[in-house]
Design a protein with these regions (language model features):
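Periplasmic-binding protein-like
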Residues: 265, 291, 295-336, 383-384, ...
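Ligand-site clamp/hinge motif
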Residues: 213-265, 398
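Surface-exposed binding/hinge segments that line
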Residues: 93, 127-198
Length: 528
């Protein structure tokens, strides 16, 4: 019996689990105990794109704009904005009552410093920076953007969830963008309790009593954020069986990523709700290192893409229910504005094993090792890794599998060292599927070298086409460029698409007000 089968049968049979403390319920203290995808190693949502950090940071930090359930950007920290000079000047005004968790008021210069830090690290932020003449704070309430070229998607970009354009005090925003901030001080509805953090065990967030919510009804990340409980605990439980058993027993309240094979068992429990929260899903991918080793060779990357059967990967990730995934997919997510069929035969009609071996030989591959970082503590990434590694080995690729936890990979993937000095070749990841909608927001298509996301591809042709897409006002020309950028990606392989998966969450039925959108959020949620 495989591991998943063992876990499923073990839960059904009531196998022994470690005892877990009950969350505080009743009286003056109400705690939601949430089991995230993996260990929380940093709260800096600019420094990393880790999903666990994104979800935790959303409680603590705010953004100038937030997206509603339909992903429309709405004012959040700003009261509103005006656009003048044919789109070249944006003036944003902060709303009243904004205060950081250290007691200081939020002022415009905090926002300017925070946004400049974000623009250094984020792909779309870099695009804005390229089009920016000046971002200034003429007074405590006002931000003024002076652009070289119009950028109508500015509010949408500032509302993105990963990497997030979080606003922090100026003293923290002045931290080197490639180093972690020393503190997690935001202005959101919950504050981070650094003194109670235990790596690999828990992270604590407390209601911020001085938070001033917007007056509008909440919809996902737009409107009035209201903390309805006193505390949220992120409890780290790497073992899927233990986590599911704890939820079934009422020892925890919410599983972000239950093992797909355990969904049936969880659905059978009277106190458990199994439902989608992230209704847009996740884009599973492999990211190759474009600087060092065999994966720096585009021919090798094309052969590796050809070796992957997306349906096999998604079946391993989500189990046998095809309604929970879409595969095969290209470099844009199906149903988004830029999705197209250009080059899709590369993933729909895969070459034979012998043909893939011939591709490797033609690329000059001679059995050099590929270091694959395999996160065994992440349910979905673990499954992606296992299928991908087996597929690569099957066509003769020498894979050195390095099994570790996701937190270690989040830190290690920042290294640009060669393989012989502890570097890496590839790792799996999940990106917010809703962002892979066009060449602007599909940031991992970018070929801007050392400024690109981990893996650091350099592709001037892709950058030229991306800029042309942004400058165009002709929908037909943009459609042509959608196809051209996808064809280019099939040639250069900035990342390897594995499919789109739509995992449901599982939570206790006494949690009410759980919001749907593009990620889990903890405001508006009550616990009975």
């Amino acid at each position: 019996m495989n591991r998943r089968g063992l876990l499923a049968s073990g839960i059904a049979a009531g196998m022994v689990r470690p005892a877990l403390a009950q969350p505080a319920i009743g009286g003056k203290s109400v705690t939601i105990v949430h089991v995230p995808q993996g260990n929380l190693v940093t709260m800096d949502a600019v420094w990393t794109t880790a999903v666990v950090t994104r979800n935790a940071a959303a409680m603590v930090f705010e953004t100038l704009y937030g997206r509603d359930e339909a992903l429309n950007p709405k004012p959040q920290m700003v009261a509103g904005h005006t656009v003048e000079e044919n789109g070249l000047r944006w003036t944003m005004t902060l709303r009243d009552g904004l205060r950081f968790h250290d007691g200081t008021p939020v002022v415009a210069r905090d926002c300017v410093a925070s946004l400049k830090r974000w623009m250094t690290r984020d792909g779309i932020g870099q695009t804005i920076a390229d089009r920016l003449n000046e971002l200034s704070a003429p007074d405590d309430k006002t931000l003024v953007w002076r652009l070289k070229k119009p950028f109508s998607a500015l509010p949408y970009a500032l509302a993105k969830t990963q990497p997030t354009a979080i606003i922090v005090p100026e003293r923290l925003a002045n931290t080197d963008p490639f180093k972690q901030m020393s503190e997690a001080i935001g202005s959101g509805p919950f504050r981070y309790v650094a003194g109670e953090y235990v790596s690999g065990h828990r992270a604590i967030f407390e209601k911020f009593d001085k938070y001033n919510p917007r007056p509008e009804p909440v919809s996902f990340a737009a409107g009035g954020y209201r903390a309805m409980v006193d505390r949220v605990e992120f409890r780290i439980i790497p073992d899927a069986f233990t986590a599911a058993g704890a939820l079934a027993a009422g020892e925890v309240d919410w599983l972000d990523s239950p093992l797909p094979d355990l969904l049936g068992m969880l659905k059978s429990k009277p106190g458990v709700e199994v439902a989608p929260i992230d209704i847009y899903g996740t884009f599973g991918c492999l990211r190759p290192n474009h600087l060092h080793g065999p994966t720096a060779n585009a021919g090798v990357r094309r052969a590796m893409l050809a070796a992957i059967d997306q349906v096999d990967v998604m079946t391993a990730v989500m189990g046998g229910d095809p309604s929970l995934y879409r595969a095969p997919v290209g470099f844009y997510i199906p149903g988004t504005p830029s999705a197209n069929d250009a080059g899709m035969d590369r993933v729909r009609k895969r070459p034979t094993k012998d043909q893939i071996k011939a591709m490797l030989k033609e690329a000059g591959y001679a059995g050099e090792k590929i270091v694959f970082m395999h996160p065994t503590d992440q349910v979905y990434y673990d499954a992606m890794s296992a299928v991908a590694i087996a597929a690569f080995r099957d066509v003769g690729i020498n894979v050195e599998e390095q099994s570790t936890d996701w937190g270690t990979i989040v830190e290690r993937r920042t290294s640009k060292e060669p393989l012989e000095k502890g570097g890496w070749s590839m790792f799996p990841y999940g990106a917010p599927a809703a962002e892979y909608r066009d060449p602007i927001f599909a940031t991992n298509l970018r070929g801007n070298g050392g400024a690109a996301w981990f893996g650091w591809p350099t592709d001037r042709e892709m950058e030229t086409m991306r800029n042309a897409w942004m400058d165009s006002t002709d929908p037909a020309e943009q459609k042509r460029l959608d196809a051209a950028t996808q064809l280019r990606a099939f040639e250069t392989v900035p990342y390897i698409p594995l499919g789109q998966y739509l995992p449901p969450a599982a939570y206790r039925k006494n949690l009410l007000g759980v919001l749907k959108g593009a990620m889990p959020v903890f405001w508006n949620v009550t616990k009975g």
